[in-house]
C-alpha cells in the first residue's frame, strides 16, 4: 500500500516534464542470470531506451534479486525495459526521490 501511495504522490506533486527516477525491485530465476552473464556491460546498458538511463544496478546473487535505478522522461520507458525481462524476472517499479526532493515534497 505504501508503494502505491508513493506512486500517486509522485505523479500528483512532481513536475511531470522533468525526468524522474524509478527503482525496479527484481527477482530473477537462474535462466536470467545465465543470459545476463553472456552479455557485455555495453549490451546491458544499450537495453535502456532513448529517454531513459541506468543510474545503478545492484544484485543479491544469493537470492537472485536486486534493484535497478533508472532515470526516465516517461514511466512507459521503464516499464518497457522491465517487460524485456518479464519471462525470467518478476519486477516492481516504484518512483523514488532523493533527500532534497523528499524535503521539498514533505514541506509543501
Report the location of each language-model feature.
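Short amphipathic alpha-helices within nucleic acid-binding modules
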Residues: 73-83
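Short S/T/G/P-rich N-terminal loop/turn motif that feeds into the first structured element of a domain
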Residues: 4-65, 73-75, 98-108
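N-terminal cationic-hydrophobic initiation segments that often serve targeting/anchoring roles
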Residues: 49, 82-86
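Conserved short beta-strand edge segments in small beta-sheet-based binding/regulatory domains
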Residues: 88-100
Amino acid at each position: 500500500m505504501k508503494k502505491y501511495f508513493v506512486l500517486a504522490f509522485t505523479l500528483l506533486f512532481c513536475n511531470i516534464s522533468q525526468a524522474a527516477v524509478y527503482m525496479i525491485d527484481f527477482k530473477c530465476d537462474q535462466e536470467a542470470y545465465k543470459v545476463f552473464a553472456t552479455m557485455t556491460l555495453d549490451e546491458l546498458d544499450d537495453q535502456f531506451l532513448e529517454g531513459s538511463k541506468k543510474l545503478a544496478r545492484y544484485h543479491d546473487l544469493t537470492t537472485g534479486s536486486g534493484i535497478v535505478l533508472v532515470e526516465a522522461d516517461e514511466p512507459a520507458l521503464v516499464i518497457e525495459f522491465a517487460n524485456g525481462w518479464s519471462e525470467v524476472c518478476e519486477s516492481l517499479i516504484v518512483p523514488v526521490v532523493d533527500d532534497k526532493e523528499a524535503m521539498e515534497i514533505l514541506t509543501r
